[in-house]
């Protein structure tokens, strides 16, 4: 099911398509958000956090006639990578993840794949990213923000052109991700939110891993 279809035009030149899919990741939450971002002019696309149901993601990419350039993982947990192998095999695309969480893709004690009923995937990323790196999908630019806390290598993606933030499991609607898991830290996640994410423009739209997108400043700061 498609919850959001957003097309935006910047300066009459750049057209961005953003699709939010609800996929079954096998967790207690069951349905989680997977995002597809595409530059409509070049057809280049990026999938963010393919937590499950690879067929649903692939079907949408085919509908968009997308050229999958990147598969971006905000961190290494199993409920964010459930569709990773099939998606990579069938559509290509380079796997990107923050350098600190890269090891977790092949370490079930960090990825917690057993928790979501997955086998250990033993997969290495094609490239690693770090804080302030930039990623381009056609003419759309995203900046990597290292947001440790939920995991030590958690990251968020920010698009300054449209003030969009993909926050993974760091920031939700009025709350934050769990900090009782391997490599997680309560102090780190609060610092990531207060010192990095809350310093973005007030009208930034937050697209989290679960629940709805929002741009209500009060719900981002009343933590």
Model-assigned labels for residue ranges:
Residues 12-64, 156-168:
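Conserved beta-strand hairpin/beta-sheet module of binuclear metal-dependent hydrolase folds
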Residues 2-15:
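Short, Lys/Arg-enriched N-terminal segments with co-localized hydrophobic residues
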């Amino acid at each position: 099911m498609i919850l959001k279809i957003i097309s935006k035009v910047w300066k009459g030149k750049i057209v961005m398509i953003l699709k939010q899919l609800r996929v079954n990741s096998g967790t207690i939450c069951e349905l989680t958000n997977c995002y597809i971002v595409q530059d409509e002019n070049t057809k280049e696309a990026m999938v963010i956090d393919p937590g499950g149901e690879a067929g649903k993601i692939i079907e949408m990419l085919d509908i968009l006639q997308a050229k999958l350039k990147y598969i971006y993982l905000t961190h290494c947990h199993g409920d964010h990578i459930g569709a990773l192998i099939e998606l990579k095999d069938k559509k290509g695309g380079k796997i990107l993840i923050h350098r600190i969480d890269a090891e977790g893709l092949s370490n079930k004690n960090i990825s917690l794949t057993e928790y979501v009923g997955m086998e250990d995937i033993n997969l290495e990323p094609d490239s690693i990213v770090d804080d302030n790196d930039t990623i381009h999908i056609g003419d759309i630019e995203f900046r990597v923000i290292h947001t440790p806390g939920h995991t030590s290598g958690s990251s968020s993606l920010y698009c300054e052109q449209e003030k969009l933030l993909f926050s993974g499991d760091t920031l939700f609607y009025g709350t934050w991700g769990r900090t009782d898991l391997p490599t997680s830290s309560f102090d780190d996640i609060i610092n990531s939110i207060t010192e990095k994410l809350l310093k973005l423009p007030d009208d930034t739209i937050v697209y989290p891993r679960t629940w709805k997108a929002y741009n209500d400043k009060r719900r981002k700061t009343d933590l």
